[in-house]
């Protein structure tokens, strides 16, 4: 299964929806089956500190538009 998530708030908001999104993704990662993937769609790279709060896994991938910038 492939799950897409609008991750704009995850990489830009420290509290509120950003915190909720990071907690949601971090809660889903341990439940993923071998072939499952989480695709986190965001229009920019956002804040590295906030991106790093998401569990690093081969099954989690950020997806940016071709013209994405900091």
Model-derived features: positions:
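Carbohydrate transferase catalytic cores enriched for Leloir-type hexosyltransferases
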Residues: 1-70
């Amino acid at each position: 299964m492939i799950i897409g998530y609008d991750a704009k708030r995850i990489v830009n908001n420290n509290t509120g929806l950003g915190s909720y999104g990071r907690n949601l993704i971090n809660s889903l990662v341990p439940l993923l089956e071998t072939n499952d993937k989480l695709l986190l769609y965001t229009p920019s790279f956002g804040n590295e500190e906030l991106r790093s709060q998401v569990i690093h896994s081969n099954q989690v991938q950020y997806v940016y538009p071709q013209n994405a910038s900091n």
